[in-house]
């Protein structure tokens, strides 16, 4: 009988506004005068609290807008596309106007005072008889802080509701503002992250006195516990996806295109993050394209494109350019392309991905994923000498979620650090040129390196490899929720071998009846889904003319039909030529054979390979197949860019001539949002840069091309060939 009564108990009074409301709601105030419409939030229809400005010119409460954008991706007023990271805190002037709004004391039976909104909390603590009557004075508040970290006069903590946004959860878990929006920087007055919508909605930014350090520390632990609770409830964003699915069911009769939540701001730049993807159908397509692999200068597996109707798009957290480091605990940070594809194609209802997003402001190096390590206390000194102040050291620096400091993510082949030979991946950088970085950031470390003239003095802590699996592997459960062998019961990830691809040209004369179909389906062609591809055979009909002949196979590239070249023609033109033939047809084709390395049939990799072999009807060309085509089949395009005001073209390149590895093409590894390359829209991750202003890049070393791109002014013409990534 007591439980229903306690469930109906009123919410505790808030020590900031004096009203009874839950932790997930904004403060309530009574305004004796009408508030100007420009100072009203058009989501809650109340005066603005902690206002955020959108790029389209509207202003909302931080808490209101954050919760709105969890399920939507547009501005509530004009429905223009909107993400939280593009919003900025309103100006100091707007905040001052809001703080000066007159409010009445809510305890009217004890106090009738009218005062400015920013003074109400101080009024409760010092001179309000009503606040003293209800226990909201300073002494009572201090005693109740352990029960209500946000200042509510309650002796019991209130758990956050499932509606708390995932963005708010991430904000509660860290005291470090994101790199994407410098406006979200916590101030000394706040004592907490400025981007935390729950806490910012629960406190006044202009309170007259700062918090005590012990109070801030206590609140931090409370925030972490609340954040973990919400993450368990939302199952890493699956609840959001379910809301989107329900919305689609309710809008089946509408003609508007489906819009999925844009939650990619939940993955921080420059940090290794694990996410959980749920699928009802274990074999449902991810609807993404992948490029990269250890056989290419890209090294990593990178998302090139995300289709709007797939699992990844519904999840909403990943972006093109994100690097996939692990798949269900299997390390793919340095494996061949097809090996990673096999792992990603393995059916599972729960897919764990460990990913990393490139930082917007970073040293332009590629990287590899660190393994699990056990730290040691010893350290050593490394002195690197640059040939010029502009030369890069050839290391990529990242932070870790579970450890403070700066870590080396990768040592780039051929760079200064690589030639020196002392630095290794996952080394912790303790200091640079005497500056302590034990609790520093990769950005500050990069700044110190760039500011060095010639000599860079690093203090580094070496760590030893720890033989331990991932958390979910150690627990003995696989991605389907069933028991799997422990680490001692099966071997570690084998080192995959690189496949070999050969091209063989052939001429085939086929006889058929005049009205008989050839029995094959072709794809590709000029402007084929934004990629200019050769015409290739995507399937052969069993029992048809081509199938009976047996010489033209799925995957063959058609070069010529009865003397007519098929290069640079559209698919419809190629189909018309194939249908025009009578009783005899001569096909010139390029047969592309891919030989996978022989593996032990009992190894996990071999089992995965056999399990995930796509049937012929589902065959699609892999990205590495396109790379092996002869140059005559390249459909190159010229892209003209102009530098922005910051002087950057906005893309990162890897590859080039190396003394020990020979000549390799230059690949586009990443593209920075808001730059000329990004705004042009035609450059993708995995594209090959063939020439700059007509000058071939073949045979260039990386430093030479980087210097050339940096020094060129005005119009810059890039000659690029773009191949579609492997579809999953």
Curated annotation (Swiss-Prot):
Q: Quote the EC number.
A: 2.3.2.27
Q: In which pathway does it act?
A: Protein modification; protein ubiquitination
Q: Where is this region: Interaction with MAGEB18?
A: 186-244
Write down which residues bear the modification named Phosphoserine: 441
Disordered, as annotated region: 178-214, 475-494
Question: Which positions make up the signal peptide?
Answer: none
One Gene Ontology molecular-function label: zinc ion binding
Keyword annotations for this protein, in alphabetical order, are:
Cytoplasm, Metal-binding, Phosphoprotein, Repeat, Transferase, Ubl conjugation pathway, Zinc, Zinc-finger
GO cellular component terms attached to this protein's record = cytoplasm; hippocampal mossy fiber to CA3 synapse; postsynapse
Q: Write out the function statement from the record.
A: E3 ubiquitin-protein ligase that mediates ubiquitination and subsequent proteasomal degradation of NUMB. E3 ubiquitin ligases accept ubiquitin from an E2 ubiquitin-conjugating enzyme in the form of a thioester and then directly transfers the ubiquitin to targeted substrates. Mediates ubiquitination of isoform p66 and isoform p72 of NUMB, but not that of isoform p71 or isoform p65.
What name does this protein carry?
E3 ubiquitin-protein ligase LNX
Renumbered to this chain, motif NPXY motif spans: 181-184
Question: Which InterPro entries does this one have?
Answer: PDZ, PDZ_scaffold, PDZ_sf, Znf_C3HC4_RING-type, Znf_RING, Znf_RING/FYVE/PHD, Znf_RING_CS
The cross-references to Pfam families, in alphabetical order and at most eight, read: PDZ, zf-C3HC4
Organism in which the protein naturally occurs: Homo sapiens
């Amino acid at each position: 009988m007591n439980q229903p009564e306690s469930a109906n108990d009123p919410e505790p009074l808030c020590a900031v506004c004096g009203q009874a409301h839950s932790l997930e709601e904004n403060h309530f105030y009574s305004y004796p005068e009408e508030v100007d419409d420009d100072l009203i939030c058009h989501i809650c229809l109340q005066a603005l609290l902690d206002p955020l400005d959108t790029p389209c010119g509207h202003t909302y409460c931080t808490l209101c807008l954050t919760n709105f954008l969890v399920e939507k991706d547009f501005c509530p007023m004009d429905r223009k596309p909107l993400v939280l990271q593009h919003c900025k805190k309103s100006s100091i002037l707007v905040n001052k106007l809001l703080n000066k709004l007159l409010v009445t004391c809510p305890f009217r039976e004890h106090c009738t005072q009218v005062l400015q909104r920013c003074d109400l909390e101080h009024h409760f603590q010092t001179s309000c008889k009503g606040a003293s009557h209800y226990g909201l004075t300073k002494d009572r508040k201090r005693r109740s802080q352990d029960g209500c970290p946000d200042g509510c006069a309650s002796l019991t903590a209130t758990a956050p509701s499932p509606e708390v946004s995932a963005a708010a959860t991430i904000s509660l878990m860290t005291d470090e503002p994101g790199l994407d929006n410098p406006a979200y920087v916590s101030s000394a007055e706040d004592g907490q992250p400025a981007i935390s919508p729950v806490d910012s909605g629960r406190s006044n930014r202009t309170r007259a006195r700062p918090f005590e350090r012990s109070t801030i520390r206590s609140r931090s632990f409370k925030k972490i516990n609340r954040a973990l609770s919400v993450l368990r409830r939302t199952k890493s964003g699956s609840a959001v996806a379910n809301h989107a699915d329900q919305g689609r069911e309710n809008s089946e009769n509408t003609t508007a295109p489906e819009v999925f939540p844009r939650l990619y701001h939940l993955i921080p730049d420059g940090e290794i993050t694990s996410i959980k993807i749920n699928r009802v159908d274990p074999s449902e397509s991810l609807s993404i394209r992948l490029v990269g692999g250890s056989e290419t200068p890209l090294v990593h597996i990178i998302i090139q494109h995300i289709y709007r109707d797939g699992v990844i798009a519904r999840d909403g957290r990943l972006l093109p350019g994100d690097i996939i480091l692990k798949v269900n605990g299997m390390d793919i940070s340095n494996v061949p392309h097809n090996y990673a594809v096999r792992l990603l194609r393995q059916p599972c209802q729960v897919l764990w991905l460990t990913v990393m997003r490139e930082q917007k402001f970073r040293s332009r190096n590629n990287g590899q994923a660190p393994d699990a390590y056990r730290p040691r206390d010893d350290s050593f000194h490394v002195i690197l000498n640059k040939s010029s102040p502009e030369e890069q050291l050839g290391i990529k620096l990242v932070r870790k979620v579970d450890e403070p400091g700066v870590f080396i993510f990768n040592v780039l082949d051929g760079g200064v650090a690589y030639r020196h030979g002392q630095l290794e991946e996952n080394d912790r950088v303790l200091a640079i040129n005497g500056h302590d970085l034990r609790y520093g950031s990769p950005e500050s470390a990069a700044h110190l390196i760039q500011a060095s003239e010639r000599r860079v003095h690093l203090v580094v802590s070496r760590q030893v490899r720890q033989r331990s699996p991932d958390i979910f592997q150690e627990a003995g459960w696989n991605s389907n929720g069933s028991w799997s062998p422990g680490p001692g019961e099966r071997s570690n990830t084998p080192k995959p071998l690189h496949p070999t691809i050969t091209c063989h040209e052939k001429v085939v004369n086929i006889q058929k009846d005049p009205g008989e179909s050839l029995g094959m389906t072709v794809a590709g062609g000029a402007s084929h889904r934004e990629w200019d591809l050769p015409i290739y055979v995507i399937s052969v009909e069993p029992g048809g003319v081509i199938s009976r002949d047996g010489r033209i196979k799925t995957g063959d590239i058609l070069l010529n039909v009865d003397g007519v070249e098929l290069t640079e023609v559209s698919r419809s033109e190629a189909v018309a030529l194939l249908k025009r033939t009578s009783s005899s047809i001569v096909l010139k084709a390029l047969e592309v054979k891919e030989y996978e390395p022989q593996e032990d049939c009992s190894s996990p990799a071999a089992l995965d390979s056999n399990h995930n072999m796509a049937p012929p009807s589902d065959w699609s060309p892999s990205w590495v197949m396109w790379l092996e085509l002869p140059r005559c089949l390249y459909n190159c395009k010229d892209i003209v860019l102009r530098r922005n005001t910051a002087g950057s073209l906005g893309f990162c390149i890897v590859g080039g001539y190396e003394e020990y590895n020979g000549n390799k093409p230059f690949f586009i590894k990443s593209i920075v949002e808001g730059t000329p390359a990004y705004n042009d829209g035609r450059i993708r991750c995995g594209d090959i840069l063939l020439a700059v202003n007509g000058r071939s890049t073949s045979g260039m070393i990386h430093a030479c091309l980087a210097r050339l791109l940096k020094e060129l002014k005005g119009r810059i013409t890039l000659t690029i060939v773009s191949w579609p990534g492997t579809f999953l």
